[in-house]
């Protein structure tokens, strides 16, 4: 919502990004702000960045058309140039997220506890799904490479954590995105990420009051929200729900404070 409709950070209005790389930069700023104002982890989905790939594609295409005006360059050649430049921008955008997350400090004096969700099934159409696959591929490739420490040695960064969803389009040889699963497995063998979620089991286990199953990311690295249907819209809601983190309740204190009154006990609880 903040990427699509704009947001305010430190009193400055940030409008909807006009390129993929800008969207990645703003996403890291949002991550840092949220991490500084809550306990517990948070998660973002690469699906929310996918629409900005096409925004950049159209922007780059317009630039290429202007550059090639009057030249005898085929449409196919122009498309190749556009896609090459687009891949380069996606590379820079993903790198921005990786390095910003591990170098930004929250008000707690630590890096944001962030998980990146990679789920092809969230895409709204075929083009967005293909663009999302490019982002996922670049994210996994960069994590496989790692980041350099102060000695210049490639190491595994602690954050962001990665979660990859296994689904019908990527789980078996011959499926359209099986190459991503192979790449993810190769990365896990070296870097111990990504973790994996089964879409099939999530749809069976996370069923809302409408009887519909849902596949979604956890908060941070392990805690899953319970299914929730927004009473105003009648639709399930998982993104944008505040993560309060782990809470300890002193039942003895609550009992003493209630003075033996059961109604007051549950009200305090």
What do these predicted ranges mean?
Residues 1-269:
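Conserved catalytic cores of very large enzyme subunits
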């Amino acid at each position: 919502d903040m990427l699509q409709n704009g947001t305010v950070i430190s009193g400055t209005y940030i409008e909807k990004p006009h390129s993929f790389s800008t969207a990645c930069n703003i996403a890291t700023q949002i991550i840092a702000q949220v991490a500084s104002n809550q306990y517990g982890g948070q998660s973002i989905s690469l699906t929310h960045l996918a629409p900005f790939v096409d925004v950049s594609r159209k922007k780059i295409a317009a630039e290429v058309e202007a550059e090639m005006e009057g030249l005898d360059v085929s449409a196919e050649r122009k498309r190749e140039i556009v896609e090459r430049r687009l891949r380069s921008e996606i590379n820079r955008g993903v790198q921005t997220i990786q390095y910003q997350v591990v170098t930004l400090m929250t008000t707690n004096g630590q890096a944001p506890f962030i998980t990146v969700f990679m789920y092809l099934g969230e895409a709204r159409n075929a083009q967005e799904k293909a663009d999302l696959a490019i982002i996922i591929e670049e994210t996994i490739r960069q994590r496989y490479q790692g980041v350099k420490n102060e000695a210049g040695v490639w190491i595994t960064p602690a954050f962001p954590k990665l979660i990859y969803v296994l689904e019908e389009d990527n789980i078996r040889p011959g499926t359209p995105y099986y190459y991503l699963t192979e790449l993810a497995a190769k990365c896990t063998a070296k870097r111990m990420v990504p973790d994996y979620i089964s879409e099939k089991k999530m749809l069976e286990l996370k069923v809302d009051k409408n009887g519909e199953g849902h596949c979604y990311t956890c908060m941070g690295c392990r805690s899953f929200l319970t299914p929730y249907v927004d009473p105003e819209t009648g639709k399930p809601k998982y993104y944008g729900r505040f993560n309060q983190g782990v809470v300890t309740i002193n039942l003895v204190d609550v009992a003493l404070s209630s003075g033996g009154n059961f109604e007051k006990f549950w009200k305090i609880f």
